[in-house]
């Protein structure tokens, strides 16, 4: 009990000293500065080089860019190196009963999307792909891909593939299942 009184006395002396040496305006000013600083934190750039390096560590030779190994193909749509999957981060819906443009039965399409420009090696053109999440069931676990071509940091959410976009799906289907990759048009 005696220790509590010493602690109380110490806190009281400290608070009285702070109150005697500072004004309300300075406290409010410092509080406002801190709140502004906290609000600006999401605008700071995000470095993802370590994440890309870990994802490609087994395949990339030492001293090379891990993304340099990305060679798109136009044959197997369930493979991660299929040209439309250049910026997908999740599971390909074609492996779960869906297709490149349709969600599997029973899942709901999220209203929001993120976009990327992917190169088609067959016709030599780049296309704008609007990745959209299918929601409502647990993650399928089939055909997981982590491709980061053209991905931008999280503070540009329309180009970030790390966000689960299921918040806009109908019936409050908030559980991520897989991602579709329809073509929006040619990229110029």
Curated annotation (Swiss-Prot):
InterPro entries linked to this entry:
Amine_DH_Ltc, MADH/AADH_L_sf, MADH/AADH_Ltc_C_dom, MeN_DH_Ltc
Q: Which domain of life is it from?
A: Bacteria
Please indicate if the UniProt record lists Nucleus as a keyword.
no
* First and last residue of the signal peptide: 1-57
* Molecular-function annotations in GO: aliphatic amine dehydrogenase activity; methylamine dehydrogenase (amicyanin) activity
- Could you give one GO CC term from the UniProt record? outer membrane-bounded periplasmic space
Instruction: Kindly give the Pfam families that the UniProt entry links to this protein.
Output: Me-amine-dh_L (PF02975)
> Tryptophylquinone is carried by which residues?
114
Give the catalysed reaction(s), semicolon-separated: 2 oxidized [amicyanin] + methylamine + H2O = 2 reduced [amicyanin] + formaldehyde + NH4(+) + 2 H(+)
Could you tell me which cysteines form disulfide bridges? 80-145, 86-118, 93-178, 95-143, 103-134, 135-166
Q: How does it assemble?
A: Heterotetramer of two light and two heavy chains.
Per the record, the similarity remark reads: Belongs to the aromatic amine dehydrogenase light chain family.
Q: Which organism is it from?
A: Paracoccus denitrificans
Q: Under which pathway is this protein filed? A: One-carbon metabolism; methylamine degradation; formaldehyde from methylamine: step 1/1
Q: Does the keyword Electron transport apply?
A: yes
Top enzyme class, one word, equals oxidoreductase
Q: Where is it localised?
A: Periplasm
Q: What is its main location?
A: periplasm
> Which GO BP terms apply?
amine metabolic process
- Entry function: Methylamine dehydrogenase carries out the oxidation of methylamine. Electrons are passed from methylamine dehydrogenase to amicyanin.
**Mind telling me where the Tryptophan tryptophylquinone (Trp-Trp) cross-link is?**
114-165
Task: Give the cofactor binding note.
Answer: Uses a protein-derived tryptophan tryptophylquinone (TTQ) cofactor.
For this protein, the Enzyme Commission number is 1.4.9.1
Q: Which UniProt keywords apply?
A: Disulfide bond, Electron transport, Oxidoreductase, Periplasm, Signal, Transport, TTQ
Protein name (database record): Methylamine dehydrogenase light chain
Tell me its cofactors. Answer: tryptophan tryptophylquinone residue
């Amino acid at each position: 009990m005696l220790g509590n009184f010493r602690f109380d006395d110490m806190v009281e002396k400290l608070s009285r000293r702070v109150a005697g040496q500072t004004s309300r305006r300075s406290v409010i000013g410092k509080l406002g500065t801190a709140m502004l600083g906290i609000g600006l934190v999401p605008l700071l750039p995000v470095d993802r080089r370590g994440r890309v390096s870990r994802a490609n560590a087994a395949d990339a030779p030492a001293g090379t860019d891990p993304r340099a190994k990305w060679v798109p193909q136009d044959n197997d749509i369930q493979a991660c190196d299929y040209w439309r999957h250049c910026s997908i981060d999740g599971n390909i819906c074609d492996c779960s009963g869906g297709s490149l443009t349709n969600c599997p039965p029973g899942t709901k399409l999220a209203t929001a999307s993120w976009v990327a420009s992917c190169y088609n090696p067959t016709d030599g053109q780049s296309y704008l792909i609007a990745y959209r999440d299918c929601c409502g069931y647990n993650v399928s676990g089939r055909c997981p891909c982590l491709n980061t071509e053209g991905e931008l940091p999280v503070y540009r959410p329309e180009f970030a593939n790390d966000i689960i976009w299921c918040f806009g799906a109908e019936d409050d289907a908030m559980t991520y299942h897989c991602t579709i990759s329809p073509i929006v048009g040619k990229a110029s």
